[in-house]
């Protein structure tokens, strides 16, 4: 037990001695740094043996170009930092003052920019690698403080985040010109829609409702199907035949030829008088005909004739005076065409028959 306590005490003494030596070394180190605060020694260029002598002065020109490049890079870095510091300031007054005032250049900022922003390092520091870096005595650059987004959006020359606000166009393009008096009165009554840009007078959309189509109450009346509408102007009103003026069908007891005119003298169309003006039409079926050329027998021709008679009778019973008038006019026209030119008659009759069968016209 005694040996263990002796060993522990000896180890504790050794640790204390080591700590004292470390503290003494730390106190000596800053003293040496204070002694070495002086400028680095200037190294003179050794005289060459004649092998690398600049006979034409090329070395001097290269040194001058390097110095010019260093000065140019310094000025560029200064302008960039000044622009950034102006943009991220918080007060509007300081921003305006800095924009209006010329940029200030000082030797301290040039030195710091040259060391921190890629400027050229002196040759003495490059050659003497063992030398410690000299602490800069210039004050540090002021830290940039970011302004809030609201402040940046309200600052002049910057675009706001909200594109829908009307102040965006004013800041971007300036104040729009005043609206003429002639347009002010129209704009009060008609819907106004803004133009594509914030400049220029507003476009006035004309109301698409036609004023001359409105009633006294301001409503658009419904027009009947018999009224022709041509570009907003009321067209021809077709006359309607009242049901009292229409004569009864031929199957009801009175024929078209013997019936008297029941139309009034008010200009209403009289179908019976028009039927009397037409030449009489004989609806008959010829038995026989060209059955031999077509290869049909007499029995087939008789069946076809009976079917035609039935269809003609059905049409006559179901038709009115209007249908009879239209049919008689068509048949009379075909007869005149046949007497004039048979080729035209065959072409027209075939086209007419195809239309009748296509649209199922009775």
From Swiss-Prot:
Biased composition (Low complexity): 100-112, 153-167, 241-265
Source superkingdom: Eukaryota
Regions of compositional bias (Basic and acidic residues) in chain numbering: 12-23
UniProt region (Disordered), positions on chain: 1-117, 153-172, 210-266
Bias (Acidic residues) ranges: 51-70
PANTHER family according to UniProt: PROTEIN CBG07386-RELATED, PROTEIN CBG16638
Protein name: Uncharacterized protein F10E9.3
Native species: Caenorhabditis elegans
Organism taxonomic ancestry: Eukaryota, Metazoa, Ecdysozoa, Nematoda, Chromadorea
